[in-house]
Structures are given as structure tokens and as C-alpha cells.
Amino acid sequence: MVRLLALFLIVGVLTVKAEVEREFILVSGGPSLHEWEKFKAEPHDRWWGNFIRSARVRIQEIQAKSGPGTKITWLVHKPSYLRRASRQDKQDLIANIVSVRDKYGVNLVWFEEGDELIEYLNAGQPRDRVKIANFEYYGHSNRACWMFDYSNEIDSGSKSWLHENELARIHRDIF
């Protein structure tokens, strides 16, 4: 009888722990290319890692405050970094990003389109047991959308974005 009671107690504790698991989500959009920016009065993104470094610094802050085992998922717009690497920087930017993942032990998820970001938010983890504690975006934006590849493939524009009208597709109960 005592063993059965202990078993129920252990199962109950594990169930409670599973219900309160939290995930921090960081998103890094991509850098622009100099070939588009060089004609502007105020070009930006001279360094490829602006949005990568910002996320890395935040990862360090979260781990310092919440502990090294904290669940952190980092979504990165891969096409932008592949394009920047091949057309401008001539170095393996993907390996640099992966090295951040490896050093800090975070879950790195590559994405190409806003739909993939929404899909991860809604179903990337079992959302009945893993709730999103915090969500942060590092990248280009305007008042209506996040532009994951702004001035990366086309000048002053984006082919990959998440518009405010699409936010309704994010399930409310994931937070």
C-alpha cells in the first residue's frame, strides 16, 4: 500500500512538472546585403551578425537568470545567412551560428517562411505541457510586419515576412 501511494505521489509530481515547463523563444531575421545598401544615405547591417549577436547575448542573460538547463529555442532565417555568406562575406556563417547553438546548448530551428515560424510556435513542442515563457524577435521590421530577409534578396523589400494580419493564426493558449 505504501509503495502504491509513493508511486501515485511520484506520478503526480512528474505530471505537475510537465505542466509548468517553459520555453523561451528567440527569432533572428537576416542581414541585408551591401549590394543593396551601398546606394542608401544611411546603409546598415555592415556586420553579418547583428541579429545573431543580439540573440546570443539574450541567451546568456536567460541562462544566467534561469539556469543553464533552461529550455531555449532559437529560430533563425537560414536563407538570408546563406545568401549573405555566398554573395558578400565569403565565410561559413551557418557554422558560426551553429557554434552558438553548441556553446549554449539551445535548440536551433532553421526557417524560411513566416508560416514555419507560426507552425513552430503552435506545435513545435507539446504545447499542452510546454508553454512559451517569452518571445523575442531580432531583425528588420516596419509597423505592420517582421521582414526576415529585408534588403537581402531584393532592395528595400522582403520576400519572407510575418504580417500583423497573420498573428491571429497563433494559438492563444501556447503562452
Map each language-model feature to its residues.
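Catalytic-core segments of thiol-dependent peptidases
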Residues: 30-31, 36, 44, 61-175
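A beta-strand/beta-hairpin structural motif
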Residues: 26-28
